[in-house]
Amino acid sequence: STWPAKDIFHEYALDFAKKVNDMTGGELRIEVLPAGAVVPAFGLLDAVSKGTLDGGHGVLAYHYGKNSALALWGSGPSFGMDANMLLSWHKYGGGKELLEELYKIVGANVKSYVYGPMPSQPLGWFKKPITKTEDMKGLKYRTVGISIDMFTAMGVSVNALPGGEIIPAMDRGLLDAAEFNNASSDRLLGFPDVAKVCMLQSFHQNAEQFEILFNGSVYNGMAPKLRSILDYAVEASSADMSWKAVDRYSKDYSEMQTKQNVKFYKTPDSILRNQLKVFDEVVAKKS
């Protein structure tokens, strides 16, 4: 996976693997390793495409540097869709076919499954509350995907890092602030140890989802019934992940507030409006 072993995202990858292993009765077995065990998190697509790994678990935003159109899958306001709507577009509205074409363009030999609707993500973790757009200018801030372009245009100094590298960077002062994803991941990675202010609501990634990759040759070599099991395991995992997220994230938000003295603030409307304005400008330049 592209996640540290302690991250709930790695747990989601393990959940998917268990479903496949159980349903195939051992005929197909998936072993899940954490980020860095074989390749760095941002190297997943290349590693799976080349066959260094048979498969992997991550997000499309980590491949954004390959083709900016990959931002359509949840990195940005997503044109008014939430994550479930975007998954509907992916399965029934032509998104799956578009993604296959994009992977052909970048030369990736992979079978991609997009699944797992994520809730809207916080603006992130800061040393003090953010009250206006100007407060973010010049901040050394972590994000990924087309959000890099959006925040850069807003005057933020952006550094794209995988999840496992964020807290050490904040601890050493290489970052002033950062976003990752959700209460459980953020808590497990250690955000409350380096910052006590979390700003909720943002449009930078309000409709993101996960991606499960398989090497194209490995996938095509599977028996049809095994490919069908993968199809249904992905859909079952998508639902299970969304239910687990509601339960775990809400508990961790509450416990960070009551046990770790984290203060949560709503992101000001002026920042949210500016995100939408700047995102439209970024998209216009890239179109």
Where are these regions (language model features)?
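Hinge/lid segment of periplasmic solute-binding proteins
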Residues: 91-108
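N-terminal secretory/targeting leader peptides
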Residues: 1-86, 104-287
